[in-house]
Amino acid sequence: KDTDRDVEKRMPVKLTKHYFEIAKNSKPIQHIVKATPDETNDLDGAEDPGNQMDYSPVEGLLHKYEMGLMYVVSTCSAHCRFCYREELIGRKEIKRQDGTVAKKGMAKIPEITAYIRSHNEIVASNGGVHPETGREKLREILLSGGDPMVLANSKIAAWLGALAEVGIESIRIGTKEMAFFPQRFDETFLSMLDQFHETYPEVGLRFMVHFNHPDEFLAKDEDGNYIEDSSGILKWNPDSDKAMKGLVSRGWISVENQSPIIKDINDDADALRIMQRALKRVGAENHYFFCGRDIVAHRAFNVPIETAWGVLNESQKGLSGVEAHAKLSITHYLGKTEVSAVTNEPIPGLAGSE
């Protein structure tokens, strides 16, 4: 305790009652939230491995591509031990582009909307491209954190309305709350979304959910086996089923799942195959699987890129074309890159592959 080996110092332990009940009968889920000494055996890694703060023109906003990402909250209802934002959740100080050291700040509506308005006006007056950055119109925003779904409905509504008013065409909400606390997607929240859509029907709304393993949403019997209905289809646990149906039943909302491939959690082709098939069956898309990032203590969680690619490739055998949409992505300083193949042979024309 109170040393570099303190796992609580690296990332506080936190979970919901709903998730605790699932974890009691699932080793993979236990690995998601249970702290172990392995996390601090090797503290190699970076607090900001993608140098994201180099792309932060306004506090709380990352503007690296045509899409912007906003930190709207610094907490979640439970904590994944492998969290890519552990520096934000733990409120740690990181080095910024100007050499200063400070905690990441949260986005604020006046500053964010002023930046978007100014950027898009400059782009519009210069033939559709910003003269300094080369970026096009900022048309899509991802609400992130932390988990935006821990915010009150009124705060989420305020962000949605402010972004719509400033001309954002598509809004994503990144959340793991459907796994941690699916009861959050109640009728009051869904009614708020309905009102938003009635007011701004032209604005797209996408929920980027974070299921890592099918145990997070599928129902199990007392022996730990998945439960099938009379047609042989795997049944969801009631709370997750209700939450997912609440979103996908609204045709104007898209739901897409993305997940890293993490050691002892989902580096299992059978588990990923079940998850991809079950999600697509209920109307959610399989978006990305990610290779682990070099966060602090990453060696306790990451698998080699070759392993991640092999697991995903094997998992998609037997899936239909629409079930197997997910790609493997690796994130580095310049951006996301798809891992399309792995080879031990030299690649013609690629220097250094010999």
Each predicted region: which residue ranges?
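Short cysteine/histidine-rich metal-coordination sites, predominantly Zn2+-binding motifs
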Residues: I94-T113
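A short mid-domain helix/strand-loop element embedded in enzyme catalytic domains
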Residues: G50, E59, C76-E86, Y115-I122, ...
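Flexible, acidic/Gly-rich N-terminal and inter-domain linker regions that tether
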Residues: K1-K64
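N-terminal pre-triad scaffold of radical SAM enzymes
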Residues: L15, Y55-E86
